[in-house]
């Protein structure tokens, strides 16, 4: 007697559900870590930019013999900066990324002032 066995190849519903669950678990671990790493990188770049701006302000004030409290603008220090200085957390230009006021005041990030700041 010959049986009516048909051999089907493929995955069962349970196997597919297990694979989907594993992929979901891996994604739930990887995505928050990626977002945290990206935020930390943005913060590091912005703090480096703030240090460059502060150094440019100090060099400008020494060369121009400006006292503490003297006003400073981006136009004054532009030649002391290398390339464009923009906050990576969403800035498009220096003016919408950073605020500078006086020679003795540190520059401020407009995008994330609470976390993107120079150490005192």
Locations of regions flagged by a protein language model:
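N-terminal leader/signal peptides at the extreme start of proteins
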Residues: 1-11
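Catalytic phosphate/metal-binding cores of nucleic-acid and nucleotide-processing enzymes, i.e., regions
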Residues: 12, 16, 51, 55
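Alpha-helical hydrophobic helix detector
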Residues: 17-33
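Conserved catalytic core of two-component sensor histidine kinases
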Residues: 20, 47, 54
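Terminal, compositionally biased segments used for targeting/anchoring and flexible tails
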Residues: 24, 35, 44, 59-62
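Aliphatic-rich helix starts adjacent to a transmembrane/signal segment
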Residues: 33-50
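Extracellular/periplasmic head regions of type IV pilus-like filament subunits
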Residues: 55-120
């Amino acid at each position: 007697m010959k049986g009516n066995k048909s051999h089907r190849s493929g995955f069962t519903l349970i196997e597919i559900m297990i694979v989907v669950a594993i992929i979901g678990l891996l994604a739930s671990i990887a995505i928050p870590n990626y977002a945290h790493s990206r935020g930390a990188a943005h913060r590091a770049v912005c703090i480096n930019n703030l240090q460059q701006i502060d150094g440019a302000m100090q060099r400008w004030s020494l060369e121009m013999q400006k006292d503490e409290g003297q006003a400073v603008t981006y136009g004054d220090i532009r030649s002391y900066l290398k390339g464009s200085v923009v906050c990576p957390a969403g800035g498009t230009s220096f003016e919408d990324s950073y605020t500078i006021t006086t020679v003795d005041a540190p520059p401020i990030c407009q995008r994330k002032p609470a976390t993107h700041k120079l150490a005192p």
